[in-house]
From Swiss-Prot:
Coiled coil: none annotated. It comes from the Bacteria. HAMAP family: UPF0502. This is UPF0502 protein BPSS1373. Belongs to the UPF0502 family. Pfam families: DUF480. Signal peptide: none annotated.
């Protein structure tokens, strides 16, 4: 930290599209989590954008759409294409372009990928990118990102019934607090078909458990064993 006001003054970038933000976040995340395959191929980058976990909202985009987003990030110098491989591979330049340290980049990445989060959630979710000692250190870097001109993040008003305020990124432009996604609204939602399957499985397991209990009682009676004493550990 210990940033001076001068380091906050950076040329303003245009607002990113939601897919550009997702692509940028994936590039930064995978640099840390799968360094052996970084820079990323188009196929790997698209798969990262379409992940069903650790993403909010969940997307389903094509390689052509990802390429368009990459072109947009290239024009902003936020991404570039490597030249050392026969297969096109892509990498990010966010830390250099925005002039932010790796700790702040880790937090911004999680906001790009997962949407609004509390400082505690950000500390947990960013652990693979950077290990923060405590929530106070997370909040300190968030405060620095919010103090930049223009700001990169904003602290949202605490929602009714919530214990903590959430933070969200501003890379896609300003968002009114009432337009921010509801907490957990897109996180790992269970499709109706899967929910019905889980209910059916629970029902089958309950019936199987009842049959097993009946069998145990029958065998205990045949052997003259008091089942009640067994369940009490006697």
């Amino acid at each position: 930290m210990n940033s001076t006001p001068d380091t906050f003054q950076r040329p303003a970038l245009r607002e990113l599209t939601p897919l550009e933000a997702r692509v940028l976040g994936v590039l930064i995340e995978k640099q840390h989590t799968v360094p052996d395959t970084y820079p990323l191929s188009l196929n790997a980058l698209t798969a990262g954008c379409n992940q069903k976990t650790a993403r909010s909202p969940v997307m389903n985009v094509s390689e052509a759409e990802v390429l368009t987003a990459i072109d947009g990030l290239k024009r902003l110098s936020l991404a570039s294409e490597g030249s050392s491989s026969r297969v096109p591979r892509f990498e990010h330049n966010m830390n250099r372009v925005l002039g932010i340290p790796s700790q702040a980049a880790a937090l911004l990445t999680m906001l790009l990928l997962r949407g609004p989060q509390t400082a505690a959630e950000l500390r947990l979710n960013s652990a693979r990118l950077h290990g923060f000692a405590d929530i106070s250190s997370v909040e300190a870097f968030l405060d620095e990102l919010a103090a930049r001109t223009p700001p990169l993040v904003v602290k949202l008003p605490r929602a009714p019934g919530a214990r903590e305020s959430r933070w969200m990124h501003l890379m896609c432009g300003d968002v009114a607090p009432d337009e921010a996604p509801a907490h957990g609204a897109h996180e790992d939602a269970v499709p109706p078909s899967e929910f019905e399957a889980l209910k059916a499985e629970q029902k089958a397991l309950t019936a199987e458990l009842a049959q097993l209990r009946a069998l145990v009682e029958y065998m205990a009676n045949e052997l003259g064993i008091d089942v009640g004493k067994l369940t009490r550990g006697v």
